Amino acid sequence: EHTVTSVDTPSEALAVSIGEHGRVDLPYMAELLGSPGDYERITTELQGVIFKDPSADADEPEAGWQTADEYLSGNVRNKLRMAQLAAESHPEFKINVEALTKAQPKDLEASEIDIRLGATWLNPAIVQQFMMETFQPPYRIRYNNLIQVRYSPFTSEWRIGNKSAAGMYDIMSTETYGTHRANAYKILEDTLNLRDCRIYDTIEEDGKERRVLNQKETMLAQQKQQAIKDTFAGWVWQDPQRRNLLVKQYNELFNSTRPREYDGSHIHFVGMNPVSYTHLTLPTTERV
């Protein structure tokens, strides 16, 4: 087995570097070209084929270089933000910004996004707004913020405080979106925590108490639960400002990744020493 000791072009040096080291190794590539330490020729000729990661050490010109297929994949939204920040003080990163801008995934529109109650990325303020607008609690509750939605990222649990504050005579809470056994706020809390609402009775048997499922009340409560889900599905996109905010947030969180793409086309390099390296391949993103 022969070892390549020299090449004629940066493109050939890149092919050997990837084949031998699995990465863009500028010192090794410069050695192959017979000009140790001369990285400028390589980076200039391979502009757009390799990219320097802005997070790499700026004092090490040979560090942090990646092939285009590697750099322009993964979380390209985060990478674009980093490149834009770097380009403000280092104009050489403008090429990164241009390439990453073209690599951004197409934004999903509201009609392509399904947001359900219980999604942990939802801002509790949005759920609070839905709850107030839909259940329409008495003025004293709204004015004093007596019933509040909270989410704990530590326990991944949603909580609605003071669920009984609306009272048993509040029609929206106990009839329209809830029952007398489980009011709307209790059902909403179950829904946020992805639980089916269940109603239990406590009975005494042989001197001991035990809980048994009340099927009739449970069925009624689950009908109200479905009504709340359906109402939210229609409500969430109604307000244009809220819609734009949620679409942007969803795309940032869940539509930021670009898969790494290999074309598979063969590039043949000739003139390298020894002859055994006359067939080397690179993705077309690395062709020059």
Regions found by a protein language model. Name each.
Residues 238-277:
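Pre-P-loop entry segment of helicase/translocase ATPase cores
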Residues 278-284:
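Conserved small/polar residues in nucleotide/adenosyl-binding loops
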